């Protein structure tokens, strides 16, 4: 390579690096709001970045929404009290957790229901672990983690033997290497589960936090991001030994955390999205985005740099009570980088 070509190549690399760094340091802003409407409550939202679809459980049905236009693509009926959705693009399948004690399997292309599998009480947080080919569901009232083979025959599928967790699970995160971490809300702990041996390896306390609910993971740097309600914190925990290495204050009513490869996020019912990152070995909040009352859950499309937060308009709250959502006002707030 000539000196001139080498210089040109180095200049291109430097430009790309600086551009990426500048983008990573950009501010997050509310870009738009999809006014979706429809009936029912809302819980965990799931983004399928490959198809640009949003999956939104609405109590008795699950809405499929175009992530770019906000238009409703389909509506999957037949649930009683749904909570979350896991998608498996390589199998063209989706899975809905139903708190009434079931997992609904559906086709990602047609959105048709393929089958319903008996689960355990209060089937709640749900994720897919590609390393094992398992769909994992935290069942709160039952106090167990259940697993289901993602490629199981929808007509004959049954769950594997449940794994007793020693507490009430809320959400979970997989490391892609055979382990899953599960928040135990009532025990102020994170349970570490080996999916190969199907045993709980450890219970890690979340002090100085408590009532852990939201959970996400940085598999490269071995970090968990734990959203706690009592007290209100986002904790950063090492997956090597359970040591808390970051302690960040957040707003009221957290229900989800996410990681984008550079920053960690915590969404809250109060309508404040906390953005945190590690600087000089110390975790700090670098931005707080006002997203609106009720935006307690979220999902992120890391490729598009978009965060989607479901909420609604609310009636004025009575003293000592939570505000009630107005019928037909469901919407999705879209946050992106500026």
Residue ranges of predicted features:
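Bacterial N-terminal signal peptides
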Residues: 8-18
């Amino acid at each position: 390579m000539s000196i001139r070509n080498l210089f040109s190549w180095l200049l291109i690399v430097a430009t790309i690096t600086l551009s990426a760094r500048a983008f990573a340091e950009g501010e997050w802003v509310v870009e738009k709001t999809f006014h979706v409407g429809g009936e029912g409550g809302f819980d965990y939202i799931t983004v399928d970045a490959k198809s640009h679809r949003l999956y939104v459980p609405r109590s008795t049905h699950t809405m499929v929404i175009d992530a770019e236009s906000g238009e409703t693509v389909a509506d999957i009926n037949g649930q009683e009290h749904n909570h979350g959705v896991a998608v498996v693009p390589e199998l063209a399948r989706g899975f809905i957790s139903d708190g009434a004690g079931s997992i609904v399997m559906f086709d990602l292309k047609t959105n048709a229901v393929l089958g319903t599998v008996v689960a355990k009480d209060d089937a709640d947080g749900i994720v897919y672990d590609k390393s094992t080919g398992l769909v994992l569901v935290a069942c709160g009232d039952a106090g167990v983690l259940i697993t289901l083979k993602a490629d199981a025959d929808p007509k004959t599928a049954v769950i594997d033997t449940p794994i007793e967790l020693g507490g009430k699970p809320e959400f979970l995160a997989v490391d892609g290497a055979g382990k899953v971490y599960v928040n135990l809300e009532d025990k102020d702990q994170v349970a570490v589960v080996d999916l190969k041996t199907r045993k709980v390896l450890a219970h890690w306390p979340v002090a100085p936090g408590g009532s852990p609910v939201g959970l996400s993971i940085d598999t490269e740097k071995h970090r968990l991001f734990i959203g706690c309600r009592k007290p209100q914190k986002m904790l950063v925990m090492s997956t090597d030994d359970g040591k808390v290495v970051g302690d960040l204050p957040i707003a009221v009513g957290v229900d989800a955390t996410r990681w984008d490869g550079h920053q960690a996020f915590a969404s809250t019912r109060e309508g404040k999205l906390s953005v945190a990152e590690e600087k000089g070995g110390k975790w700090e909040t670098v931005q707080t985005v006002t997203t609106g009352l009720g935006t307690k859950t979220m999902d992120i499309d890391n490729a598009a740099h978009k965060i989607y937060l479901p909420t609604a308009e609310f009636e004025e709250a009575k003293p000592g009570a939570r505000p009630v959502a107005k019928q037909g006002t469901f919407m999705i707030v879209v946050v992106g980088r500026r």
